[in-house]
Amino acid sequence: MASSREIGRRAGWVPRAAAAAIMVAATTAAPADAKTLRWAHSNDATTMDPYGAYIPVNASLLNNIYEPLVRYDRGYRFEASLATEWTRLAPDRWRLVLRRGVTFHDGNPFDSGDVVASLKRASDPNSPYRPATQMIKDVVAIDDHTIEIQLQGPYPTILNDLAGVYIMDRQWMEKNDTLRAVNPAKGEESFATRNANGTGPFRLTSRRPDVETVLEVNPAWWDKAEHNLERIVYRPLGADATRIAALLSGEVHLVTPAPVQDVDRIRRTPELKILEVADLKVALFGLNIGAAQLNDSDVKDRNPLADRRVRQALYQAIDREAITGRLLRGLTKPTHALIAAEIQGFDPVLDTAPAPFDPEAAKRLLAEAGYPDGFRIGFDCPTERFVNGEQMCQAVVAMWARIGVKAAYQSHPYAPYLKKVLNGQSDIYILGWANTPQLDAFSILNNVLHSKTPRSGTWNPGKYANAEVDALIDRAGSEVDPVARKALIVDAFRKVQADYAAIPLYREPLLYGARRTVETWAAPDSKIRLWLTRMN
């Protein structure tokens, strides 16, 4: 039996990510509206429904309105939120004691019925959040402030999953006919799409999609407020120049993200500052390994990527130092690991290069594989979602050309890009994986590196398959001993590295621009925690 106290001690498997996150002190006088934070982001949240879609912009806004049962502290260790205690009764069963005296923004009291209804809604087959709850077999309310969760089997990361599921108000859902989840990807909406009622530190008071969202402080919040904010005005400003102009003029106090090309300008402006941290998201290239034939290649009788030597050649031809030093202006560093150091399961050995940057060695590998003159191959990148992503992809095209690989580069808006990739129509593609909201290596292992099954390989359009890797991932998915589990995870990643099944590049740089009056935590999961934000 494991208690919350025991789990807290075991949380040493997570390095102190707080050392990488930054608290920036205020240095100038406060403006007249010191308690109103004006925040501009590059795009708008797609929905106010906490189970509508897990994308960073949604999570960054909604984590201030809704709360989970357990949350992460600044070191990415579990701490109490709407649950104050959690106990593992058996490898497949947990008991959670809920916080008393909590109310939703409309005044309804929080109790176990809300948790049962929320987990049922998140588990709905139509819910985009179903993957986070698929291991939950049943949830039972023992009393008003105690629940028990029965799992499908032994499962070590249920707390990680629960940390990403926000709790909704059962009475509010019943009243507004939104007990059943809707899927925005199918064009579906419900009352929860444009309205919200959580227990969090701020409540939604106004919502105009793609124009402005207004939050106001929740005076009845159960936790101790570290912020001094009364009101937040959130505006989507898509154009980089517009966003930075608003920051320079004082129209907004915080911009997320700050464009790489404007970092020096912001730093030179006395009233402004840059908050920077390495994102949890690792930028990597996915490879169409399992197809019989590539989509866009002059090799028609076989798939060059099916040969490990070809994959290694592509790996060794990339000058990561040049990419991070020049294109990304030294704001991040190369990585050879597929997960960030803050992610559960990371080991420093995973950031060891399986082979060095060596174009001449890459040419020899191609010749050994039967391609002394190289070959043509399709290569797709999105026009958005990655910092200087198009420039990086074009730089890699030039690097591969030096070894004879002619990458037929195409850039696409993100939506058609994603459709092409997931349909298996791309030979090489860029993917960013942050392992959120789970913050566990099982996320990328099971979703990206496991072969396709009903529960695995959702993001493996390249059809990479290794029976030994699959077996290790499956065992890690049910191993509850943390030491044994980490060994399985590291072993799986080492085999993936030896296969060159994916090509990690770097952790994305996460950059915020702010007035010097703003003090906040630049967290590597890219969420703005308004309850940890002050204006001075």
Model regions: which residues?
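N-terminal lobe/hinge region of extracytoplasmic solute-binding protein
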Residues: 40-90, 120, 131, 195-201
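Structural transition elements
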Residues: 316, 333-368, 386-390
